[in-house]
Structure formats: C-alpha cells, structure tokens
Amino acid sequence: MLLTLIILLPVVSKFSFVSLSAPQHWSCPEGTLAGNGNSTCVGPAPFLIFSHGNSIFRIDTEGTNYEQLVVDAGVSVIMDFHYNEKRIYWVDLERQLLQRVFLNGSRQERVCNIEKNVSGMAINWINEEVIWSNQQEGIITVTDMKGNNSHILLSALKYPANVAVDPVERFIFWSSEVAGSLYRADLDGVGVKALLETSEKITAVSLDVLDKRLFWIQYNREGSNSLICSCDYDGGSVHISKHPTQHNLFAMSLFGDRIFYSTWKMKTIWIANKHTGKDMVRINLHSSFVPLGELKVVHPLAQPKAEDDTWEPEQKLCKLRKGNCSSTVCGQDLQSHLCMCAEGYALSRDRKYCEDVNECAFWNHGCTLGCKNTPGSYYCTCPVGFVLLPDGKRCHQLVSCPRNVSECSHDCVLTSEGPLCFCPEGSVLERDGKTCSGCSSPDNGGCSQLCVPLSPVSWECDCFPGYDLQLDEKSCAASGPQPFLLFANSQDIRHMHFDGTDYGTLLSQQMGMVYALDHDPVENKIYFAHTALKWIERANMDGSQRERLIEEGVDVPEGLAVDWIGRRFYWTDRGKSLIGRSDLNGKRSKIITKENISQPRGIAVHPMAKRLFWTDTGINPRIESSSLQGLGRLVIASSDLIWPSGITIDFLTDKLYWCDAKQSVIEMANLDGSKRRRLTQNDVGHPFAVAVFEDYVWFSDWAMPSVMRVNKRTGKDRVRLQGSMLKPSSLVVVHPLAKPGADPCLYQNGGCEHICKKRLGTAWCSCREGFMKASDGKTCLALDGHQLLAGGEVDLKNQVTPLDILSKTRVSEDNITESQHMLVAEIMVSDQDDCAPVGCSMYARCISEGEDATCQCLKGFAGDGKLCSDIDECEMGVPVCPPASSKCINTEGGYVCRCSEGYQGDGIHCLDIDECQLGEHSCGENASCTNTEGGYTCMCAGRLSEPGLICPDSTPPPHLREDDHHYSVRNSDSECPLSHDGYCLHDGVCMYIEALDKYACNCVVGYIGERCQYRDLKWWELRHAGHGQQQKVIVVAVCVVVLVMLLLLSLWGAHYYRTQKLLSKNPKNPYEESSRDVRSRRPADTEDGMSSCPQPWFVVIKEHQDLKNGGQPVAGEDGQAADGSMQPTSWRQEPQLCGMGTEQGCWIPVSSDKGSCPQVMERSFHMPSYGTQTLEGGVEKPHSLLSANPLWQQRALDPPHQMELTQ
C-alpha cells in the first residue's frame, strides 16, 4: 500500500493549481517526470497546425515559428495529424484527394483518391487508420495509412458531419449538423448510441482524451450566438460556457487545460481556459480576407498510447534504450513486433542487434578520391589541395575564383562547369548554392545552442545542461517550471507567460511610477524602485511582505539589478547621476560611481564575471562597464548611440544586448564590446528595457504599449504581446535557469523540511529515513510503527490534497475575477489588425467588434480614445489619502499617497513619528522637546518665556513658529535635507528658499539651469543665443551710422551743387560782389583795391623787409633772398601774382607800389579766409573774420611777421 501511495502522489500532483510559485505546464507522457514537486515534462512544447486559404500553416502557442508547411493544399481542407509518423493528413475536397506531408513541410505526397462530400476526418493513431465521414451518403469510411483496404465502417447515418476518435477507449464520435445530435460507436462499427439531441446547430467536435470529455460548438438557429459545450463519453455531466469573444466560433482543439478555437470573421486564434473561458489570449495573424479553417494542437499527449499493451517483454526490444536493441537505430515492425534497423544498419544474425554497414568496404559509396565510414553512414574525403564539391562525392583541385565573381559565404573554386561555392570542413552548402551551414559556419548549423560535428559534412544539435532539444532537433527549451515574464507597467507590476496566458497584476497599490525591477531567485522576491515616491522596495512573489529598503538619497531611480550570488543589489539614479549599491536588506548602502557619469538608466550585473554594465543617456551617450566596486571602468560602446536605454546579459553565450529608444534598434556585442552588430531596427517602436532567455530577446515598447520578442541571433520571428498596457518598462524572465548559479537551498533550506539539494537552480527536497515526502514535495510525513505494521497505510483524510487546493482556489479566483477587470493578452504575429487604421492613443485600448473597432481610454485617463489625457485624481478629490497626515501625488494614469513630514507609513496609513524619543530634533541642550502630531515643540528651560524669546545657545531651526514661550518645529534642517542630496547636478550647491518654500541651486561656472543640468553644448548654445542678440544690436547701430553718413553726404552734395551754380554765373570770381560790398563799407581803401582770389585761397603773412623806393630784391642761392633772408624751398603751388584768377592761391602785395608783392621769408600755416585788404604802414590788414581773433590782432601789429593762411 505504501508503494502504491508513493506512486499515486506524483500522479495526483500533476493536477495541482498553478500559481506564480508553481507555474502551469502540460502533463507528462507515460509518467516521465523531471524536476521537483512542481515537476513538468521533458518533452517538446505543443504547437498548432491550421488551414488558411489553400495553405496549411504551423505556429507555436507563443506565436513563434510561424511558417507555411503546404502551399497548395486545396480550397477546402479537412485535416488531422499522426504524431508518431510526424505527418499531417488532409482531404482536398476540390481535387478529391487524401494527401499527407511531414510536420516539417517536407515530402508531400498523395495517399489515395476519395469521394465527394467528405465532411469530417480523424486519425486512429493506434490502429493506424484514417477515418472520414460523408454527409451526403450518410456513411463513415475507414482505410489504412497508405490508402489501402478501404471499407465502410458505419452506414445509414443522419448526415454525419464532424468526426472524432479516441482509440485508447476505442470510441468514435460524430455529430449530425442538421439534426443537432451527437452519437458514439465502437471502432468496430457496433454499439451506436445517441448521446444527446438539441434544437440548435452543432458545427465542430473535439475530444479531451486526458479528461475523457467530448466538446462541441453549438449555435442557435439564427446563428447569432455560439457556445462551447462538453459532456462525458456517456453524454452526462453536460457543461455549457459562453466564451466572451463576441464572434461566431468555427473550429476548435483541446490540450491540457486550454481550448484553442478560431472564428469566422476574425483572422485570429483564441486560447482560453477550457473550464471557465477565462485567461484568454488572442493570436493575431497576418491580415487576410479568408477566415481560418481546421485547427489542431500537435503534441504526443494529444495522441496517448493505450494502457493495456499486452506485448511480451521479448517483443518490446526496440523500446529499450539499453540492452539488445538501441532505440536510436531501430524501430519496430507492427506485424512481427521485431526490431527493424535504420538506414546504414543491418540486423544481426540473432535478429536482436543492429550492426553498422561499412559502405566504404563495398565500394558503393560514389566517392572519387576518399571514403570514411561512420556509424550508420559514411562521408567522402579529399586530399590536400582539393576541395569537396557540393554534391559531397567529387573532389576538385582548388583554383580560386576572381574576387568579382564570387558571391559565396565561404569561398569559391573554378571548375569546368564554372565557379562553384564550397564550404569549410564541418559545413555544407545550402540550397541557394552560396550559403554554408554547419558547426563551422556563422549559423552554427542552425542549432540554437550547441553544434556537435559528426563528420566533415554532418552534425547534430545539442543543448546546455538543463535544456531539452525540441522536436525540430535544433532549438532548445529550458526544462523545469514554465518560464514567465515580470514587467513594470509604470503604475503596477504584471506577470505573463510567454504564450500570453496567466496574465495578471502582481502589485498595484501605492506604486506611483515604477521603471526599475528585478528578481532574486534565491529568496524568490522582487525588487523595484519608485520614481514618484523616491524609494526602493522589495516584496514576495505573491505581492505580500512589502519592505522599504532605501528611503533617503533616492531621486529618479530607473534601473535596478540584483546580484543573486553576491547578495547585493545595484541601482541607477538619473536625477543624481550616480550608481548605488546596497545589501539585499537595504543596509550598508553606498555610492560606487558618480564621477564622469551623466544620466545612467539601464543596469545589469554579471556575478560570475564580477562586472557591472550600464547605459548612459546623457550628452555623451555610451555603454559602460566596471567592477562590482565601481573600479576598472571600461567604455563598451560610444559611437552611433543616441538614447541607450535597457541592457541585459545572455549568460549562456556571454553576450551583451541593449536597446536604443531614439534609434529604435536592438544591438548585441561581446562583454568587452567587440563584435558589435545590430540585431534589428526600425520595427521595434520605442524600446525601453530588454531581457534575454532561451532563443529570444524580449523588449518593452512604449510606442505601441506592448512586450515584443525576436530571435536573439537573427532578429527575426518578431512577436508582440499586448493587452491594456500603459508603459511597460523593466522586463525580467523568471526561471531557475534565467540566473544560473543560484542556490535556492541557501534561503530557508529551499522550503524543504528535511534535505534540500540544488538541481539546475531549483530546490529538490527529500526526506530522511523513516519519512516520506508529502504531496507538496517539501514536507515529510513520519512512518511510525503502527503505520508500517498496518501495511504502510496513511490516513489522508486531514491532508489537503492538490485537488482540494484546486477547487478552493478556483472558487476564490472566480470571485476575484468577477469584481476586477480581466486582462486579455494578444499575441501579434503581425501589426496589421483591425485596430491599425483606427489610430488609438497609446493610453487607450482597442476593442474590436466584428469588422468595427473602437478606442477606449485606459483607467486613469479620459478622452475619446484617440486622444486620452491623464486624470488628476488629487485635484478631483478621488484619492483616499488622509489629508492630515499624507499628501497626494498625481502620476500618469493614477496617484500615490505619501506620508507628510513627521509621519511614517505606507501613505494610506500614516503614524506620527516621536522625534523627541528618537532624538530626531534640534531643540538644543537648553530646551526640552515635546512631541506633537506631525512634529514637535521646543520649550526653554529655567526661565520665563517671553514673546520672541529664544533659548540661550540654541538657534531656532527653519520653519519655526513662535508662540509665546515655545516654537513648533516641522523641519529642523536649515539646509536642503538628505532627500535632496544630489538634487543639484555638477557640484552645484543646494539651497532652501524659506520665503518661497522651494529649493534652488547655486551652480558653478559653466553650468546653468534649475538643477545645473545644462553644460557643454547646451550651455554654449544658450550663450551663443545671447551673443546673437548682441550681434543684432551691433548690426542695428552700424546701419544707423551708415544712414547718418549718407545724410551728411547728401548735404555736402547739395552744397557742392550750389557752389557750382555760382561758378557758372561768375566764372572769374564768384565772390567779387561780396568784395565790393566790403570795399564800399571801407572808404579808406585804395581805389583800385585788391585782386580777389577764388575760394579756397591762401593768405600769406611772412617776415619781410620794407622795400622802399619799390626796389625788388634779387633771390640768392639755396632759397636766400638778395639781402640774405630765407626764401621758402617748397610750395603747394607756384606763387602767382594777384589778379590772374587762380583757384589755388595768390600773392597779396603790401608795398607802396601797387601790384607789388612782399618777399616771403619764413614759416607758414593754413587758415581759411575770404579776402584781405591792404593796410597803411606796409602791413597787411586781415579780413574781418581774422581780425576778430585776438591772436591775429597781436600778430597783425607785429611788423616783422606775416601769416600764411591756406585751405
């Protein structure tokens, strides 16, 4: 009995309820388990095959590996699959053919011709038969897998439409679409039984072979409403559920707890819980006008083997992995049950062994120069200087092609047939004749992890420990619990499986704005940082036990990384331009990097390499690395970056991945920055954060709020997961292998009661001798003597089994879901959907109803759906924040409550802090502290209180409120508090302005801005703008000066014009008339007067001798006169006698004889004049303009001197 119990417990445990700590997985085939109490199968993941138009496609349940298997399958396709054969069978109604193809799309072939009016088909995978129904003829026909031995199984039926088979129970089911009935019969064609009848229409039938239930789609006669119904194999326990798709259902298939179905109008595949219709996921395929057709889920558990296998042990030799016959090289004949050897092997004489055939020894290999035998095969070889041609048989001498000829990925050889591409050893040429594939080629032989060479032309794929090779024999999937995503959604934290299932909210209350998030696999806790509340928290994976770790010195934390081995966490603060570190409990926090860092955002830690990696989105964007202490900094990338945001590490390959939000690119490189390349660009929206696991890179998109993934090597196979998201930020993959090296047994013994052992990152519990493991896989039950003597029976009446947990939890889950908004994830294989032309706001969700789509603003936003604005809940008075002890902070799409100064709590429940008892006051030694609500008061000791009195040796802190003999304190710091440490950037000094109740920064030279955030280019741009204003002023001033000069020139021109006009009237002397006027006013003047000179002219007054008797001196040599006096040696113009009309000047005679001129002897100076008159006594008399000058008068009375005035 004890043995039976031990065997049954794992079987029962597979029905346990799925939670975050025990994610859901498919049941295990043939009882093979892997892992601990939350075990899952070691086997392939399920995938879907479906008909669409005249083609057959396949796609994973996660939306990946979407490919076309059959191109021309026919217009109307009815299909099923045979898992053991790895084949798809379908009926082409147009050509009346039964055809088949392998699951990978290869070797399409015809099976047999088939009659018209086939309405349904199913595969009997145990008896190796194909069964189909003919609605017009009212018959069901059966044939073998090769199309032979066809015969009618059932006849005289009422319009048999859909067919389903359970060969394990040996039942065949079909529906009558016209009559609305369901029937059952044995596979032998006997025992026909009507299960139920309905007045409505039945369109599709499918079986749940594990739970032994029949499912069908039921329509009302108007076709306006569709339901999914089920019953047991006897027609009892009928269950009806309405799936909220608002579309008519067409085809369906079941697997595990999920139901997959398609609709008529929508080009989508829906996934939902088969019991409740909830946990819905929609796979949105490429836009098409043709609806989806048949739909099947492919997995070995969908076609289980019969349990009553009665073969003898000697007839099962081919099933053994060890022994007489290896399962890797032999199969089993269905008739004789004896071993059959694979190609390249021959059966041994005792017919129990498969022996290798040496093809090289029989000379039937076809190699031209060399042959080498391998187990089950062989390959051709070539000597040095020769290369193996693409046919794998012939060798050719190596003659390289010209460079302009070769387009080969490896190298090219010239042959008589022309240039041919060839590949290195370990690779082969692809079908395009240019690309190489293999372990020695860049594609790694198509293997997602390990490529193992078997020969120079063959290889096989393998996986790292903890990963399983999938059905395609190339990709690897992590074993153990099903991985899922955690992501910060700005105002909450959500979780979701890779296929969109289990989509829900983990934390939503008092979140504010959360961009930073990470997971600790050892204690199974999440760490996250608030940018609105400005602190860092942690909580359990179920959202309980929230703890504040860092509350002081945090401003804008946008990146966070947990060192799960070193037991620390690191964060980036973009507001304070630093990187901090702390123990996981929040103790011993310190700043490790602050110098030469501008705006750090994303951060990742590599515990094995002991390195930190982060992105900097500042003026000089770059990717940097340092030791865990902040030393040994290294720039990974600095070119071609604009706004590098998220960063992550692939620990399997030691590759670094990051995203650039402004360039919309995903890039990768080695840990040292080498071999950098772009993985994808232009189709990733606005990526914010990035994560990597298995074969895919995940990243969050703000442009179309969603989570996306692409292949981590090629950048292809893009899939989008969306569903009522706001701003998905940090991404974390939760799985034991996502962070290798973690030891869950270090924390609380891994949850095990007795013994804990680490197995691939998970805790494996076992019990000591005398105990047995309970159903939870962690606790141990004592086996006392009474139990052993009684046969080891254990009373499980009071034990809570997983089935009890399932039922109770589902009831509570249903109650919660009814009161909350149900999140529905959508897998977008293509961005072309019905919502694309609507243009919804990024803060709205699209609701598709048939061919119409509308936009609805998300919670916390208001608008018409195309334009949604944030609702200020604080202004509207919606929040529940207690006004006396907390304040409301509005955030994007929500709000948070934060306790006021003097209080502590979660923002909604705030308690007063006793500053006096804690010593957090500044009353001084001569004052006593009294705690008050939200603050404290200081009272002077030993003296009477007076208004305005301050205690001696005590300085009142800021924000004091004087009230007679005491003052009340709200904030005892005179400078900026610790919460604003680092508020001012680039060495700026923080100041608190009490009058304005605001903080300000005193910036150093070269930095400006509210927080001294502008420098270098930004600062110079502002300065350049100021210089530009100055230059504008200078330009205006110059223009004014030019205008003034032009005005002066115009005046001068006018004056010049007037002078020329006077000259034209009196060309000899224009000033003669004025001279006459002067002479008429001077009667003492001589009658003849003086000969006037035109203006300008010279008035020359020099020292001279009085030449009596009219005698003229004779000039001597070297400018001396006849009397020895000096004569001028240079003149502007030769002196001329007066009266000759010269325009440059004239000589003025001053002798007793008329017309004679004085003798010039010495210095001269220029001065304007308008005429002269002769004075008596031999001295010139100046013009009235000159005589008015006292200096001139003095000089005029001095006989020995004369003056020369020149213009």
Swiss-Prot record:
One term under GO cellular component: clathrin-coated endocytic vesicle membrane
Cytoplasmic membrane side: 1054-1207
Extent of Basic and acidic residues compositional bias: 1070-1085
Disulfide bond residue pairs: 318-330, 325-339, 341-354, 360-371, 367-380, 382-395, 401-412, 408-421, 423-436, 439-451, 447-461, 463-476, 745-756, 752-765, 767-780, 835-846, 840-855, 857-868, 874-888, 881-897, 899-910, 916-929, 923-938, 940-951, 976-990, 984-1001, 1003-1012
List of glycosylated residues: 38, 104, 117, 148, 324, 404, 596, 815, 926
Cited function: EGF stimulates the growth of various epidermal and epithelial tissues in vivo and in vitro and of some fibroblasts in cell culture. Magnesiotropic hormone that stimulates magnesium reabsorption in the renal distal convoluted tubule via engagement of EGFR and activation of the magnesium channel TRPM6. Can induce neurite outgrowth in motoneurons of the pond snail Lymnaea stagnalis in vitro.
Protein name listed in UniProt: Pro-epidermal growth factor
Organism: Homo sapiens
The gene coding this protein: EGF
